[in-house]
């Protein structure tokens, strides 16, 4: 199971004995994946976040691609789906388990993928924790410090992609929620407050600066509603996701002004404006200490982390390249 972070499958007791893989984006970008072509792919729910998944389908393909969805979506931008099933994915999975013969979870095919995932995630974890204090390190801190059962609301654009690339599996449950779609960055603070209002567990919003700016009005309602919320804000002064586009390397275009769209604002005072407290950690250990002390505490806490979009691009690409090298070495050591 290549688990998108928004599926919720990466965190919980099911990871103890089910083949749930966290490194799908990196695995599918690697040369290793070229030699591991499945006969059948079943895509449950919405189109996954991973661009690596889409590139892999273009590069390697599969005999059958079955899309399972019950919301009338069309999760097939490349028109590769061969079969469509109108069913709620979780319910269909339960019926399959009930009616199909016992599925072998320890066969050679499964073991090959789970072994590759183990190599990939150990490689990725080292980059997140040993590299610069940037978005991958923030994901590592969230993974290690959020209490079991907490709600993690994740903004679109880079936060959900950072989570996809760097969040490992863990038996501790974590409820991950994400707004996806054409207007995915809108209403993030309001969404997080709605989650906080409907849950007794701590709620954390992981967001970028533009997404927060798009819903400052929602954030201002925190004190009036008497809700508790921790906002982990990665601030790269603009739209970091556009630094991943090929046009970012086009010297004839003012990419920074036209695509990154810097706002030039200091977002720290937003905490006081909304009646909350500001925290500005300067490193991974500091961030983990802050999260450990504020998550679940009363009121609004804004954890403001200044990051660099170019650095984050480099870390994502470094992770993909390092996983590719590590898998090649593992195959060589195994005589494969």
Residue ranges and their predicted role:
Residues 114-200:
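Active-site diphosphate/adenylate-binding microenvironment
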Residues 2-66, 74, 170-201, 214-217, ...:
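Glycine-rich, anion-gripping cofactor-binding loops and their flanking helix/strand elements
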Residues 1-15, 147-150, 162-163, 228, ...:
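Redox- and metal-dependent alpha/beta enzyme cores, enriched for Fe-S-associated oxidoreductases
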Residues 39-40, 82, 150, 300:
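Conserved acidic residues
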Residues 64-111:
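Terminal amphipathic helices with adjacent charged low-complexity linkers/tails
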Residues 18-29, 82-96, 263, 278-285:
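Short acidic-hydrophobic, aromatic-tinged amphipathic segments that line or gate anion-handling sites
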């Amino acid at each position: 199971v290549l688990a998108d972070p928004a599926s919720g499958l990466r965190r919980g007791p099911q990871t103890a004995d089910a083949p749930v893989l966290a490194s799908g984006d990196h695995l599918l970008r690697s040369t290793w994946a070229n030699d591991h072509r499945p006969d059948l792919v079943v895509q449950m729910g919405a189109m996954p976040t991973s661009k690596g998944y889409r590139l892999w389908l273009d590069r390697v393909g599969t005999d059958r691609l079955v899309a399972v969805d019950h919301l009338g979506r069309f999760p097939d931008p490349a028109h590769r789906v061969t079969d469509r099933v109108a069913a709620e994915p979780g319910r269909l999975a339960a019926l399959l388990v009930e009616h199909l013969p016992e599925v072998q979870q320890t066969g050679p095919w499964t073991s090959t993928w789970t072994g590759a995932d183990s190599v990939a995630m150990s490689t990725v974890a080292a980059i997140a924790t040993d590299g610069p204090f940037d978005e991958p390190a923030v994901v590592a801190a969230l993974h290690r410090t959020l209490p079991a059962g907490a709600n993690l609301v994740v903004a679109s654009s880079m936060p959900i992609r950072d989570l996809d690339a760097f969040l490992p599996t863990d038996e501790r449950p974590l409820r991950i929620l994400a707004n996806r779609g054409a207007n995915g960055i809108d209403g993030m603070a309001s969404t997080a407050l709605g989650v906080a209002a409907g849950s007794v567990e701590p709620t954390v919003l992981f967001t970028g600066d533009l997404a927060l700016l798009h819903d400052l009005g929602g954030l201002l309602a925190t004190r009036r509603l008497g809700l508790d919320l921790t906002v982990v804000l990665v601030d790269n002064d603009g739209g970091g996701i556009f630094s991943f586009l090929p046009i970012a390397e086009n010297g004839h275009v003012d990419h920074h002004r036209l695509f990154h769209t810097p706002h030039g604002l200091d977002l720290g005072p937003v905490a006081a404006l909304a009646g909350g407290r500001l925290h500005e950690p300067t490193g991974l250990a500091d961030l983990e200490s802050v999260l450990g002390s504020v998550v679940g505490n009363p009121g609004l806490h804004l954890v403001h982390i200044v990051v660099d979009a170019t650095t984050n691009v480099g870390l994502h690409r470094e992770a993909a390249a390092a996983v590719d090298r590590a898998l090649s070495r593992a195959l060589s050591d195994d005589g494969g």
